[in-house]
Amino acid sequence: MYKRQTADIAVISLGGTVVSTSIKVAGDNFDEAIVRYMRKTHNLLIGERTAEEIKINIGSAYQRPEVVSMDVRGRNLVTGLPKTITVTSDETLEALKEITSQIVEAVHSVLEKTPPELAADVADRGIVLTGGGSLLYGLEELIEEKTGINTMTAEDPMTAVAVGTGKFVEFLAGVRDDE
């Protein structure tokens, strides 16, 4: 049904990973949580595509200044008939709370294991989020609030890791050519 992905949290210095952890939490887990929430709270069965639309359009990891909503269609689990309900960003905040908490805990764990001299660099330069999960509204704010460290999303979060890896490979090739 869902392919398993991970969220990787790392402190990188001089092209190498100093401290890292990987948790079995990613975008698909957000979708699963929304499906479960809709079933439990509204007796509404929705598919993964609908859950992803909810996540993209009104999903929240942090309280929005104004509540946003969208109409969601699914199958009423009591009657078996199609049903449309209005879902709010506050509901997605609740649905995603457990998963976003796991991400924050993993970030906190990596920061605790970071050597003091690098911890100072992280405090100065901040935390950079990459990948699809970083596009969830409010994840930056949540991590920043819980860690006290400036948090931002990479310019192109969906390709940032791949581009960075490519640049590092080019760098290594250049180093080898110089030897």
What annotation goes with each model-predicted range?
Residues 1-5:
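Conserved small/polar residues in nucleotide/adenosyl-binding loops
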Residues 95-122, 168-171:
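Phosphate/ATP-binding catalytic cores across multiple sugar-kinase/actin-like superfamilies
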Residues 7-12:
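Short beta-strand scaffold segments in enzyme catalytic cores
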Residues 47, 66, 167-179:
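Acidic, glycine/GT-rich loop-and beta-edge segments that sit at the periphery of enzyme/chaperone cores
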Residues 119-143:
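Glycine-rich phosphate-binding loops at beta-strand->alpha-helix junctions
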Residues 141-166, 175:
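Conserved phosphate-binding/catalytic loops in two-lobed NTP-binding clefts
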Residues 16-18, 120-125, 147-150:
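Short, surface-exposed connector motifs at secondary-structure boundaries
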Residues 13-97:
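Phosphate-binding glycine-rich/basic clefts of nucleotide- and phosphate-handling proteins
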